[in-house]
Amino acid sequence: MHRCMPLVAASMAALMLAGCGGGDGDTTLSTAAATDTTTLKTAATTSISPLWLTIAKDSAAFTVSGTRTVRYGAGSAWVAKSMSGTGQCTAAFFGKDPAAGVAKVCQVAQGTGTLLWRGVSLAGAEFGEGSLPGTYGSNYIYPSADSATYYKNKGMNLVRLPFRWERLQPTLNQALDANELSRLTGFVNAVTAAGQTVLLDPHNYARYYGNVIGSSAVPNSAYADFWRRVATQFKGNARVIFGLMNEPNSMPTEQWLSGANAALAAIRSANASNVVFVPGNAWTGAHSWNQNWYGTPNGTVMKGINDPGRNLVFEVHQYLDGDSSGQSASCVSATIGAERLQDFTNWLRSNGYRGFLGEFGAASNDTCNQAVANMLTFVKNNADVWTGWAWWAGGPWWGGYMYSIEPSNGVDKPQMSVLAPYLK
């Protein structure tokens, strides 16, 4: 799951997307059509793990409609009760203080059947991989809050924000860079204040200056330190989701699991209660989740994930071209998107997890437009395990990139008309 396109803009023609290169290596995918590619027909059902969204801060009043399960606490320490009507986010109301001396929140368990998030990746802050850390405004750029507003007005309630770990933390186990943190928090604060959710995406492919997480150069403890610092910065914002990493690849799946669990432990030790999105190995491809060409399958290893806060979603990426790399203007068939999601959907339901389609995209042509529509219909029809999706991509420096939906001089890109029915 990997896409690589030149960034074409008047002053930025020399830039290339961070991480450009070889695709996910699987070119022998079956494209046999299912009987019905927009609904799921197989997989044994188990209880789906709840997803928790914050509804009140410590000491605040809140109201729930109907009878709901609400929990009170922080990080990995919680007490829960079934209730209706009005409550107080206090130890007195819940009968126990699960985390003494720590600022707590109240979260409500989200039901299944409705997609929570629909949005877009706004690229730019991850650009300039060959110029790390690079010069802001020359090698990379953060999108503007106005750009996010355009997508909000289209009905998108989530922005995925790619950025580079090396810029935010220039030295492992040391403080976050003040200037980069200011850019990041400025965007996050403006966009979340306007009502959208921001998915933070360290766009590093499980690497730091080219060294893989879990190696002697980048031990799991350093990765955990990074996430502890980021979680501490954003734990007070209920509209921030932590995406652990963009597209881990070319490493043992077990090694990635170890790093992911270290990051989750660090996030919860910082008393952050935010939702966390967890990718798999092999560019986190949905189509290859249970395949073994990259080593032990994600579908086997990632069942060992351990979130002390019990508030995670598995993030997968899925493109529609022949090798699922997202580097072609063609799509295999009108049904290929739904077909490639089905096995992962079965896995989610069989194991009680929830998923998010963190990247997908296509050029605008008849086959691809129908493939995108069928894929999104499939996700919508399986919302008991799917939580939403984010298109790849928007952002200010794309120029003529074939998957971009960034408007040009105020004019919508053609793909927006395909997405529009799914934003209502």
From Swiss-Prot:
Signal peptide stretch: 1-19
Protein location: Cell membrane
Lipidation (S-diacylglycerol cysteine): C20
Propeptide residue range(s): 20-43
EC number: 3.2.1.4
Enzyme class: hydrolase
Lipid attachment in record (N-palmitoyl cysteine): C20
One GO CC term on file: plasma membrane
Principal subcellular localisation of the protein: membrane
Gene Ontology biological-process annotations: cellulose catabolic process
Catalytic activities: Endohydrolysis of (1->4)-beta-D-glucosidic linkages in cellulose, lichenin and cereal beta-D-glucans
GO molecular function, one term: cellulase activity
Keywords, ordered alphabetically: Carbohydrate metabolism, Cell membrane, Cellulose degradation, Glycosidase, Hydrolase, Lipoprotein, Membrane, Palmitate, Plasmid, Polysaccharide degradation, Signal, Zymogen
Active site: E247 (proton donor), E359 (nucleophile)
Membrane topology reported for the UniProt record: Lipid-anchor
Family, similarity comment: Belongs to the glycosyl hydrolase 5 (cellulase A) family.
Name of the featured protein: Endoglucanase
